[in-house]
A protein has these predicted regions:
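Amphipathic alpha-helical interaction surfaces in cytosolic regulatory modules
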Residues: 1-43
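Intrinsically disordered, low-complexity linker/loop segments enriched in Gly/Pro
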Residues: 51-74
Length: 228
């Protein structure tokens, strides 16, 4: 039975509590590997599928990521859109010093994880004077379009994350896992699961995606607000 992205996060928690007893790094999922490297400072140098996101906005990782995932030609625009949106989110909101992206192909799906060590979603919104109940509430508000982006004196509605989730869960029959601070939110087409992660908080923000890309996905069908 296929492990979900939520199962992968729970596996990370087990590994972390076992003092990083890792035997085969190449078998780690993107969710686990990016967390261990960026969140916990573990060196996993033999992972060829991981790429750095540099604060200076170097974008060479994108082509390398896409090439390694072997995305079908008719769905390359899906991955291009998602990578562009999530990369921009990191640059515009996180104030990060270290970021990573990792993709991995499985027989029936593709997994991609983005992580940064920035200020996390709740702190980003608090810095903009938004009222936040907790870290899960902050994640949901960000998904629903609450944004800290301000240009020419106007606060913009943030649609990139919302569109990305809509494409993944409805267009690609996939799922999304977002961990930020002490909040964890797992989304599928039919369900939203949330929990507080006091013992294993994410120092910045993790966004993991699982996508089924065997059939062509028309991203323009999903560029509409997805209200959670």
């Amino acid at each position: 039975m296929e492990k979900t992205l939520l199962n992968e996060f729970e596996k990370y928690e087990e590994i972390r509590n076992d003092e990083f007893e890792i035997i085969d790094c190449e078998n780690l999922s993107p969710t686990i590997a990016t967390l261990l490297i960026c969140n916990d400072g573990l060196r996993l140098d033999n992972l060829k599928t991981i790429r750095k996101i540099e604060p200076e906005k170097v974008t060479t990782f994108e082509n390398e990521l896409l090439h390694g995932l072997e995305i079908p030609k008719n769905n390359k625009n899906v991955i291009n859109f998602i990578v562009h949106e999530l990369r921009n989110n990191i640059y515009e909101h996180s104030q990060f010093k270290r970021g990573l992206v990792m993709g991995k192909s499985y027989p029936d799906f593709k997994d991609i994880s983005f992580i940064d060590n920035g200020i996390n979603i709740a702190n980003s919104l608090k810095n903009a004077n938004y009222a936040i109940k907790n870290d899960c509430d902050a994640i949901l508000k960000a998904i629903n379009g609450l944004s800290t982006k301000n240009e020419l004196g106007f606060v913009e509605r943030g649609t990139g994350l919302n569109n990305t989730i809509n494409i993944v869960v409805n267009g690609c029959y996939g799922s999304v896992l977002i961990g930020s601070g002490k909040g964890l939110v797992f989304l599928t087409k039919d369900n939203i699961y949330m929990k507080t992660i006091d013992e294993t908080p994410v120092n910045g923000t993790l966004i993991s995606l699982r996508m089924h890309l065997s059939e062509k996905v028309d991203i323009y069908k999903y560029l509409n607000p997805l209200k959670l």
